[in-house]
Amino acid sequence: MRRSGVQCPTRHEPPESRRFPTMFNPSRDDVRRFFTETWRKQRAGEILTPLEAIAADWIVEHPEYHDELADADGAAARNYTPEEGRTNPFLHLSMHLAISEQLSIDQPPGIRAAHDKLAAKLDSTHDAQHAIMECLGETIWEAQRTNTPPDTDAYLQRILRRASRD
């Protein structure tokens, strides 16, 4: 018997603790709204949340995206296809945020040191992030291709190989 307000998992429902909250699985519109609103707030000099501040720093580093991010309605409707030959700014900025978070908590362990080595080699933290982004993309692609979780050891090794190349 179920009590009011208490969810008991069944064979067909995973327990609530195994479901991801919406904040970990935002929709395309949520992501676009986050970046366009962050850019609007940055330009207006409004107070930013810590995550918005990190996003705003990356947006500032990418002036090629400023006009698109300033057009919230257009950004919400725009599609980015490989045939256009344009980078999806929302995907690109989301990857910057993901890598920034990985570096802040050193997860996977060793990524911060690998990043620092790569940044020193490239003489640019921004270029290091772009190189790591390629490694992350390859790792995600491999996981999707093999229908397995991302291999964090292989991800870290890709970054270290990048840092060691002549």
Locations of the language-model features?
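Glycine-rich, aromatic-bearing surface loops/beta-hairpins
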Residues: W141, R145-D166
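N-terminal leader/targeting peptides and immediately adjacent processing regions
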Residues: R19-H66
